[in-house]
Amino acid sequence: MVINLSDQYSLLSNWVSELRSIQVQTDRMRFRRNLERIGEVAAFEISKVLEFEEKEIQTPLGISVCKVLKEQPVLATILRAGLPLHQGLLNYFDRADNAFISAYRKHNRDGSFEISLDYVSCPELEDRVVVIADPMLATGSSLVKTIQFLREEGHPKEIHIVVAIACTVGIEFVQRTEPNVKIWCGAIDEELTAKGYIVPGLGDAGDLAYGTKVQF
């Protein structure tokens, strides 16, 4: 299931436009904050499909029966680019357990790349709802590898993926390999280059958020 959050008019479209803009995206603090805002919107929308329960709450004047989230999800992010988006999710799911995954493109001299997964830290995942934050869904390779690794650690009952910008090629790849996940997108682009970059996209989200990295 794919949900394009830009299908309806909202402030989210403004934030996506600023992420894309070469005039605005050079402001790193603003870039990170816009990713964080998209994470907040996604958290609110995801909360609508999670399980709630009624709970009696004592007020100064009596008892109120309130609907509260039955269980906090596990929030997972792919380092480093996913951190601002993850923070947006965490602002709303503020008592959630967290998982961190180091998955990145290890580039070869010929321009090709492999997905390297070097580090994972995660809580118990068995029968939990997992929300994975990754700002760009391009080929989908790193996301699928991350999901497969998390499944080895436990068996989540639901997996949600939150991305700022996705490519249709990557969406289709994830849906073929992980048909039961829900993908929440800030925007969807059609083109993917031979080197695995989304067009028009926004560039390298990790570099824009935290500075240019050195390839080892």
Task: Describe the function of each predicted region.
Residues 1-216:
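PRPP-associated nucleotide enzymes
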